Amino acid sequence: MQYADEREEAPRSGEIRFDPCAVADGQSANFVTMVPRDSDLLPPVILLETTADQCPSRVSDAAVQSELTTLVNQIEAHSGKPAILAPVEEFEAAYAPSRRFDRQLWLTRSWVEPDYASRPWLMWTANRWYKTEAAQEPLRWVVVRP
């Protein structure tokens, strides 16, 4: 991502896709390398899209929760801002991050308002495949709660 070139265009943030099969230290090291420490950036987003069911070797729920806690702490220490957690429904059902972390939530469910988290969402991806002439690729249609 070219932050210097895009600073004038729109507010930016760093996103990281949590991998429950990998330790947090390596994941946060990649984030710290790619995302500058800049107070003008929006809060970082941690995408929680994959459960440990896809890992090549067994990873316990406790290990996933521990590594996620470590990742959240490291990302927030780097950014200086609380992270926004973006769990998909399957991840929320498996690990309940909306109960474990007092952070803003970005939920995803096409067309129907998501109700799978323990708290209200700040952001909602209402359509992941929105097509418009304004873009060559499908866009995410995101609703922000006032």
What positions do the PLM features span?
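Functionally critical loop-and-helix segments that line ligand-binding/catalytic clefts
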Residues: 100-146
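Aromatic-lined carbohydrate-recognition surfaces of secreted/lumenal glycan-active proteins
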Residues: 79-93
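Metal-dependent DNA replication initiation modules
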Residues: 70-74, 83, 99
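Substrate-binding cleft of extracellular glycoside hydrolase catalytic domains
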Residues: 1-72, 76-78
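Extracytoplasmic/secreted cell-surface and envelope-processing proteins
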Residues: 24, 53-58, 92-97, 116-117, ...
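Active-site beta-loop-alpha junctions enriched in small/polar residues
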Residues: 18-20, 49-51, 88-90, 110-112, ...
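Structural recognition of the beta-strand scaffold that forms the well-ordered cores
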Residues: 12-17, 42-48, 83-86, 104-107, ...
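Structural recognition of alpha->loop->beta junctions
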Residues: 32-46, 50, 96-120
